[in-house]
Amino acid sequence: MIGKLSGKVDSQGDDYVIIDVNGVGYLVYASGKTLGTLAEGEFYKLFIETHVREEHIHLYGFLTLEEKIFFNLLQSVNGIGTRMALFILSSLTPSDIQIAVNNEDKNIFKAISGVGAKLAERIVLELKGKVAKISSGSAIIKESLNIKNITPVASNEVIKALVNLGFSRFEAQNAVQGIITQNPEISIDELIKTALKNRNSNFS
């Protein structure tokens, strides 16, 4: 399973980008917002969600961990698949989505082409208990977010990321718990880096 790709943008399509990693081109589907940020020939790091099916393997890329989290959250709503989740993220940021859900603002979602009244209502109802409460207008999961503010979904994403990087789920859970106990203020990025560093030290 691929959890992250670091490489140069080779080319782009309407809904995907080709990332060149040491001469190997990976086709990665992404939201319109992400694709609009990428520039051909420039180097980027993308968080990857890998979907394995009998007939194909699809990679979905995100510039931030929070976008990946909301990609998966949206798919937990009945009637939303990968394509619709990316389409919604092309129109709304994770912060926009969280604020709309907390405010029960269905019109934000209804304004998106392809999202009808019933689906907009389901998004609000089914995500209401899954997103962290925030003050109106405030950002959600910042790059320097403290672990004490991470939602259970975000914590699971950290564990999932470590599993994608070679940990067993048991190892990942123990690593996260141990690091947080020692440093409750650690950020998501530092948590992952520390877990990898500790694991490498144990193997050396």
UniProtKB/Swiss-Prot annotation:
Cellular compartments annotated: Cytoplasm
Q: Which GO terms describe its biological process?
A: DNA recombination; DNA repair
Region Domain III: list its residue ranges: 150-204
Q: Which GO terms describe its cellular component?
A: cytoplasm; Holliday junction helicase complex; Holliday junction resolvase complex
The transmembrane residues are none
Region Domain I, as annotated, extends over 1-63
* Molecular function GO terms recorded: ATP binding; four-way junction DNA binding; four-way junction helicase activity
UniProtKB keywords:
Cytoplasm, DNA damage, DNA recombination, DNA repair, DNA-binding
Q: What does the protein in this record do?
A: The RuvA-RuvB-RuvC complex processes Holliday junction (HJ) DNA during genetic recombination and DNA repair, while the RuvA-RuvB complex plays an important role in the rescue of blocked DNA replication forks via replication fork reversal (RFR). RuvA specifically binds to HJ cruciform DNA, conferring on it an open structure. The RuvB hexamer acts as an ATP-dependent pump, pulling dsDNA into and through the RuvAB complex. HJ branch migration allows RuvC to scan DNA until it finds its consensus sequence, where it cleaves and resolves the cruciform DNA.
By what name is this protein known?
A: Holliday junction branch migration complex subunit RuvA
